[in-house]
Amino acid sequence: MGYFIRVLGVYNDVIPLDELEAALERDELNATLSADQEDDPWSVIDVLSAKGSRLVQIEKNFVFPGCLAQAELDEFRLLIREHQPLSAVQWLDGYFDRIKVVYAFQVFDVAMIDDNYEVVSSLKRAIWGKSGGLLQNDLEGFSNDEGYHILWQFPDDITGDKYCAVLDNGAWVKFRMDLGDPFQRMAFWAGEVPQMAVRL
């Protein structure tokens, strides 16, 4: 079934299909994009690998009262209250009011094979570059509008480095932390820069 990543955009400009195809070409990636309608603007895109496997489906939904995207934002408002740091929860709660469009990427298992995920990443960068706003990954959390991770929703067994940020007097302090280090985790949860993290 795969999992979801999302771009929560503050600009709802039309992103033509050929712009996304051009982004893949710039990154020297081979994939086929199939939209739900021949002319822009599209609502759903299926992305197929060079071998014809479906890597990801991208669905675009504008935010307005009673719509699916608004329901997602309302659900996120409730969900983030269970996570840390509190300063990021409060910041996100206010930022959600600015979101105008949600791009939901349903990522299928085959995207994790070989170099397929590079296609997903390229399309995400291209869309985020036009729409601005936030990034959200299931089982990871949220990144701010600069792309730094700000809310912890990782599983307990997560390891590896991550570029993160915490708020200090309203400004983001950026750093690289070890997600597997329990002491760095506790500092991040408290909204502090971990002592062993590398400031950027």
What does each model-found stretch correspond to?
Residues M1-D13:
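Terminal, regulation- and interaction-focused segments at domain boundaries
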Residues M1-F4, L20-N30, A111-L200:
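Acidic, proline/glycine-rich low-complexity IDRs
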Residues N12, P65-L68, E72, Q84, ...:
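Non-membrane alpha-helical secondary structure
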Residues N12-V14, F108-I113:
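Short acidic, S/G/P-rich loop/turn micro-motifs used as interaction or catalytic elements
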Residues D18, D27-V107:
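Short, intrinsically disordered low-complexity segments
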